[in-house]
A protein has these predicted regions:
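A cross-family signal for N-terminal binding/gating loops and helix N-caps
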Residues: 1-348
């Protein structure tokens, strides 16, 4: 596999590896997606837009430079700016790989941070010295204006050029609540929707606040994904229920959609409309209630994204998939190529 180092790759050259429910592997162009689905299938995408969640500033008690990466909130409500979760880095920025970033100064509750025009207070440490609760000073309008003016998209060292905010907005980006892009939706473009409609494939959206994908700290990375707020519209819940009752497949576009759909179905087995917070992890021990398949990016083994795929297929199938992706030189990470993995995936 090859790191995709720009945003995003041209649709005409992007590839799609399809892993059937029997475990068969086939290579296609990503622009053939609609032709690879069945009439009646329902695609569900995350329409969250990404906010500029990286904030540089000063830790007042020590005078040290820090980078704050906002990573979560308990709600999608715009007026709630007092309960952020954030990952704290020491000096430097995205040019340095996260695993080589310096540690931040020792953090304590009530420490104050100066982040450009913003002021924030550390409310608590979240069982890790770099994971904190943050409370911003000011009302919601002031805080969001400050984030817009001072923040920049969270970015990793494998992309060498600075990313603009529009680089991390997918074609269906709407409500600005994500901390990193729900990048599986980069596989979509406007022509895709025309082809899906002509094929008789349904399309629906939900909003899920995608969090950070990596911190560079093994202990903290092992806790990813963190709790993430979501909202499922009534029309989407209805479309999913109808598809399930009629025996049609529900294909999630990305891991965040899987988390939201599965969490929203825990109580009754049917997806409920409304707001919630996805907790826990989807993985090899998860009995999926809703998602029959996932359209996802090319992820590397031993990541939280990869672990979620084990709910769809066993280790042996994913190992063959990884070998095929590696041999064919598929491009990885948020701006890379795609995989369509259908539940089952147990075959030779």
């Amino acid at each position: 596999m090859i790191v995709a180092a720009d945003a995003p790759i041209a649709h005409g050259t992007a590839r799609l590896l399809v892993v059937s429910d029997r475990g068969d592997l086939e290579h296609h162009g990503r622009d053939q997606l609609a032709d690879l689905l069945r009439p009646g299938d329902l695609l569900v995408a995350n329409d969250a837009a990404t906010i500029p969640a990286s904030l540089g500033g000063i830790h007042e008690r020590s005078g040290s430079e820090v980078e704050i990466r906002l990573a979560g909130r308990p709600t999608l409500r715009a007026d709630d700016v007092h309960r952020f979760v954030a990952v704290v880095f020491g000096t430097g920025d995205w040019h340095t790989a996260t695993e080589f970033r310096p540690q931040p100064p020792s953090l304590l509750p009530d420490d104050r941070l100066r982040l450009g025009p913003l002021r924030a207070t550390v409310t608590r440490l979240l069982d890790h010295p770099r994971l904190v609760g943050l409370d911003f000073e000011g009302d919601a309008a002031q805080v969001w204006a400050g984030i817009a003016a001072h923040g920049r998209p969270i970015q990793y060292a494998h992309v060498p050029r600075p990313l603009a905010l529009w680089d991390v907005w997918t074609p269906v980006a709407a409500r600005p609540v994500a901390f990193e892009p729900p990048s599986a939706a980069f596989a979509l473009r406007w022509a895709t929707f025309s082809r899906l409609r002509a094929r008789g494939v349904g399309f629906a959206t939900l909003t899920h606040a995608a969090g950070v994908s990596s911190t560079g700290d093994p202990a903290l990375d092992a806790r990813l994904p963190l709790d993430e707020a979501y909202c499922i519209p009534v029309r989407t819940a209805r479309a999913v229920r109808q598809a399930r009752r009629q025996g049609r497949r529900v294909i999630a576009i990305g891991t965040t959609v899987v988390r939201a759909l599965e969490h929203a179905s825990l109580a009754t087995g049917e997806v409920r409309a409304g707001a919630g917070t996805a907790t826990g992890r989807v993985g090899p021990g998860t009995a999926l209630r809703v998602a029959d398949g996932i359209l996802t990016g090319v992820h590397e083994p031993a990541t939280s994204h990869w672990e979620l795929l084990l709910a769809f297929a066993d280790d042996a199938t994913l190992a063959r998939m990884a070998g095929e992706l590696d041999q064919a030189g598929y491009r990885t990470h948020e701006f890379g190529e795609s995989v369509l993995l259908l539940r089952g995936g147990r075959g030779e």
